[in-house]
C-alpha cells in the first residue's frame, strides 16, 4: 500500500468531508485533545472472537515508534512562541484558517500487508514494547492525565482543584500547542439561563440523544452529559476572567430566533452551544478562540498545583496483575521517563490521524471506499482527520477492549449540502431543475444520501428577498450563522443589501465558517435570469421555473407532497425579488468525515473495561479515548456536541477518580490505603510559559 503524506491526507480529508459550501462543519466538532498516547483495536480477552490468528508480522516496534506517533508541534518549529495574550494569539492565527490546527496528530502509514489487518493482534498494534530498562527518571503523583485537550485539561484542572497531586503529560510543546476544537455544547447552564434561554427537562435531552444513537451509546455517559453538562460549563467559566468570557464566549442562539424550538430539521434541537470567536471585537478576525481558552485553563490548573509536562509522548502504560500504576513517556529530548500514579486518565484523542488504525477499525470508512469502487485496503481511499491513536493503543496493551462495530467515523459518508453564508436549510434544485431530496433531513450526521450522488450533481440553493425572516426558522447546526451575535447579523445584512446582480456574483461574510473568507452568492431580479446564471438551459431551465412554481404552491398548502420537508420550511416561498442562489456540485468522492469517536469501552464512570467488561483498576478514559458516546454515526441533538461531551467527560471523570481513591480503589500504592484528604498536598508550582514545563 502507498503512503499518504500528512499534508495531502488532511487536505483531502477536510475538503471531501465538508463539500463545497460546508467548511463550517469543522467549526463545531472538535475532537478531543491534541495529545499523546494511545489507540486501537481488540485486546486480549474473552471478547476476542473468531477472527483469524494474527499472521507473522514484518512490522516491528521500531517501525511503529518511528512512524505511528505524531511529531507535529513537538519542537518542529524552534521559533515558536507561546501567545501570552488573546491579541498575540489572534495575530499568530492570521485569517482564522484552522487547517494548520488540523495537522496536529497526523501520522503516516506503516505500509502494512493486507493480510495483517483484521486480526486479533493487528500489525499496527503488535506486541507491547518493554521499555522499563530505558527509563532514565521517574515522577510520582496520585493522578496522571495523558493528554491536554478539552477532556484532559478539564480532568487535570478539576483533579488539582480537588486536592489531588496531579501530573498532566501533553505531546505538544507549550509554544506550539494547538487544537481544532471550537464549539462547546452544554445544557441548562447558568451562563445560558441568565440570558433568558429556555430551561430544558434533561430527561428529554437524554431520550432524544439515545434515539439518535439508536440505543448504541452508554446510557450512563449520556445521562450524565444531559444532566450535568451545564454545571461543567459554569465551573469552567468561573475559572476565567469575566472580561475574557464577555469578549469571546458567545451563547449561541439564546435570542433572535422566534421559531427556534421548531426548527426545520425533522428533529428537536436544544440551545446550549457556546462558541468561542473573536467576533464583534475591535479586531473582528472571526478566529477560533477555544484553543487559547484551553491554554488559560491549563495555566489555572498549574496555579492549583498541577504539574504539566509538555512535549511528552506516551508510549505504554505501566501495568501488572491487572492494575495500571502509571505510564512511560519520551520527553522532548528523547529521554524515557516514567510517571507512577494511583490513577491514570487517558485523554489522548482519537485514531483518525493514523491511516492504519483507521483502515482496520473504522468499518464505515473502509466500506465507504469500497462502495465507490475504490480499493478499501488502500489508506489513500480511507480518509479522516484526528490524532495518532497512541492512547488507545496503550490501553489495549493493558487489557482494554474496543467498542463493537460498526465503528462509524464522525460524519463519515456524510456530505454537506450547499447553503448560504448565513447557513440554514433552503430548497435545493438539481441538474434537471427539480428538487431531489428532503432538504430538512440534513442535520450533521444524517445526510449520507448526498454522499451517494454521482459526480457533477448540481445543487442550487435558492431564496428570495425574505431570506432574513426565513432565518428565524433555522436551527444553528454547523453551517448556520449565530443569530444572537449582533455583529454577525448586521455584517451579513449589510453585505446582502449591497448585492450585485449578474454572473460575477457578490461577496458575503461567511460566518458559517471561521476566518474572514467571503462566500460568493448570485443575485437576479427575475427567476429566469437566476436560472441563466446558474447554468440552466432548455428543459432544465423550464424544469427549474416549473419547480419553483410548484414549490410555492406546496408552501401555500403547508405540505410538501414531493419529499415531506418539515412543515416549518413551508414558509420559504420563492416569490419576491431579488432572488439569491448559492451553488455547488458533487465531486464523486466519499466524505471521510472528521475525527473518530470509536474507542475503548468504559463502565459509565470512565473506568476502562476488559473484554469481560470488568474494570481495570487505576485506568480511566475520557474524550475521544472513551467509546460508546455515540451511535453508529455522529448524530446529536445539538451542534458542538463532540467538544462539549469531551470536556464534560474530563470534568466528571475527575470526580469519579477522587471517589475511587477516597474509597481505596486504584492501581497504585494509595489505591489500597486510606487516603488523608484533609488539607492541601505539597505541589511543585510552575511558571508559564517555559520552553517545556517539567
Listing of model-derived features with the role each one plays in the protein:
Residues 1-20, 24:
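N-terminal secretory signal peptides and thylakoid transit peptides that target proteins
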Residues 12-19, 31-34, 48-141:
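Extreme N-terminal leader/targeting segments of oxidoreductases
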Residues 75-121, 226-335, 355-356, 548, ...:
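Conserved redox-cofactor binding core of oxidoreductases
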Residues 99-107, 316, 537, 541-629, ...:
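A glycine-rich dinucleotide-binding beta-alpha-beta segment and adjacent secondary-structure elements
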Residues 139-141, 334-343:
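Core beta-strand elements of the Rossmann-like FAD/NAD(P) dinucleotide-binding domain
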Residues 340-413, 637-639, 643-652:
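Glycine-rich loop(s) and the adjacent beta-strand/alpha-helix scaffold that form part
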Residues 392-394, 398-536:
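An anion/pyrophosphate-binding glycine-rich loop and adjacent beta-alpha core
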Residues 683-690:
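Conserved small/polar residues in nucleotide/adenosyl-binding loops
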Amino acid at each position: 500500500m502507498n503512503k499518504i503524506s500528512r499534508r495531502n491526507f488532511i487536505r483531502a480529508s477536510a475538503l471531501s468531508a465538508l463539500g463545497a459550501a460546508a467548511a463550517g462543519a469543522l467549526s463545531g466538532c472538535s475532537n478531543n485533545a491534541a495529545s499523546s498516547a494511545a489507540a486501537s483495536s481488540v485486546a486480549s480477552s474473552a471478547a476476542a472472537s473468531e477472527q483469524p490468528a494474527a499472521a507473522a508480522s514484518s512490522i516491528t516496534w521500531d517501525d511503529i515508534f518511528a512512524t505511528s506517533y505524531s511529531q507535529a508541534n513537538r519542537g518542529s518549529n524552534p521559533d515558536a512562541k507561546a501567545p501570552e495574550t488573546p491579541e498575540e494569539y489572534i495575530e499568530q492565527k492570521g485569517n482564522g484558517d484552522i487547517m494548520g490546527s488540523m495537522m496536529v496528530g497526523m501520522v503516516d502509514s506503516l505500509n502494512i500487508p493486507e493480510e495483517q489487518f483484521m486480526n486479533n493482534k493487528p500489525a499496527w498494534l503488535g506486541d507491547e514494547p518493554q521499555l522499563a530498562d530505558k527509563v532514565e527518571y521517574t515522577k510520582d503523583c496520585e493522578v496522571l492525565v495523558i493528554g491536554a485537550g478539552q477532556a484532559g485539561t478539564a480532568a487535570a484542572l478539576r483533579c488539582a482543584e480537588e486536592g489531588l497531586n496531579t501530573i498532566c503529560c501533553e505531546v505538544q510543546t507549550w509554544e506550539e500547542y494547538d487544537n481544532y476544537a471550537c464549539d462547546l455544547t452544554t445544557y441548562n447552564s447558568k451562563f445560558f439561563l441568565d440570558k433568558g434561554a429556555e430551561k430544558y427537562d434533561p430527561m428529554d435531552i437524554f431520550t432524544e440523544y439515545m434515539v439518535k444513537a439508536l440505543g448504541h451509546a452508554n446510557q450512563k455517559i449520556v445521562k450524565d452529559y444531559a444532566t450535568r453538562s451545564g454545571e461543567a460549563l459554569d465551573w469552567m467559566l468561573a475559572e476565567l476572567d469575566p472580561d475574557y468570557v464577555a469578549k469571546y464566549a458567545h451563547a449561541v442562539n439564546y435570542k433572535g430566533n422566534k421559531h427556534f424550538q421548531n426548527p426545520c430539521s425533522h428533529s428537536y434541537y436544544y440551545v446550549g452551544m457556546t462558541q468561542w470567536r473573536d467576533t464583534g471585537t475591535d479586531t473582528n478576525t472571526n478566529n477560533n478562540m477555544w484553543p487559547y481558552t484551553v491554554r488559560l485553563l491549563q495555566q489555572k490548573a498549574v496555579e492549583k498545583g498541577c504539574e504539566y509536562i509538555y512535549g511528552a509522548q506516551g508510549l505504554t502504560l505501566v501495568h501488572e496483575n491487572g492494575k495500571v500504576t502509571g505510564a512511560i513517556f519520551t520527553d522532548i529530548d528523547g529521554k524515557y521517563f516514567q510517571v507512577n500514579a494511583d490513577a491514570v486518565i487517558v485523554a489522548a484523542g482519537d485514531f483518525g490521524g493514523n491511516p492504519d488504525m483507521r483502515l482496520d477499525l473504522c468499518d464505515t470508512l473502509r466500506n465507504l471506499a469500497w462502495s465507490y469502487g475504490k480499493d478499501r485496503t488502500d489508506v489513500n481511499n480511507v480518509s479522516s482527520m484526528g490524532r495518532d491513536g497512541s492512547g488507545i493503543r496503550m490501553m489495549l496493551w493493558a487489557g482494554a477492549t474496543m467498542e463493537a462495530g460498526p465503528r462509524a467515523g464522525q460524519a463519515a459518508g456524510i456530505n454537506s449540502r450547499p447553503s448560504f453564508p448565513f447557513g440554514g436549510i433552503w430548497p435545493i434544485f438539481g441538474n434537471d431543475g427539480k428538487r431531489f431530496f428532503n432538504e430538512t433531513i440534513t442535520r450533521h450526521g444524517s445526510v449520507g444520501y448526498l454522499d451517494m450522488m454521482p459526480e457533477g450533481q448540481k445543487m442550487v440553493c435558492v431564496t428570495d428577498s425574505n431570506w432574513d425572516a426565513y432565518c428565524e426558522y433555522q436551527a444553528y447546526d454547523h453551517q448556520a450563522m449565530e443569530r444572537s451575535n449582533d455583529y454577525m447579523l448586521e455584517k451579513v445584512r449589510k453585505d446582502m443589501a449591497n448585492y450585485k446582480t449578474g454572473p460575477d456574483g457578490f461577496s458575503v461574510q461567511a460566518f458559517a465558517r471561521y476566518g474572514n473568507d467571503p462566500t460568493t452568492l448570485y443575485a437576479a431580479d427575475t427567476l429566469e435570469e437566476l436560472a441563466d446564471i446558474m447554468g440552466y438551459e432548455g428543459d432544465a431551465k423550464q424544469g427549474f421555473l416549473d419547480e419553483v412554481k410548484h414549490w410555492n404552491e406546496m408552501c401555500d398548502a403547508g405540505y410538501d407532497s414531493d419529499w415531506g420537508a418539515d412543515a416549518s420550511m413551508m414558509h420559504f416561498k420563492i416569490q419576491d425579488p431579488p432572488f439569491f442562489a448559492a451553488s455547488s456540485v458533487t465531486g464523486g468522492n466519499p466524505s471521510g468525515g472528521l475525527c473518530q469517536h470509536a474507542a475503548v469501552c468504559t463502565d459509565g464512570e470512565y473506568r476502562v473495561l476488559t473484554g469481560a467488561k470488568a474494570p481495570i483498576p487505576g485506568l480511566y478514559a475520557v474524550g475521544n479515548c472513551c467509546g460508546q458516546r455515540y451511535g453508529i454515526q455522529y448524530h446529536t441533538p445539538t451542534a458542538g456536541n463532540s467538544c462539549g461531551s469531551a470536556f464534560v467527560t474530563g470534568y466528571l471523570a475527575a470526580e469519579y477518580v477522587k471517589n475511587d481513591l477516597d474509597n481505596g480503589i486504584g492501581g497504585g500504592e494509595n489505591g489500597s490505603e486510606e487516603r488523608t484528604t484533609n488539607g492541601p498536598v505539597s505541589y511543585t508550582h510552575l511558571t508559564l510559559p517555559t520552553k517545556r514545563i517539567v
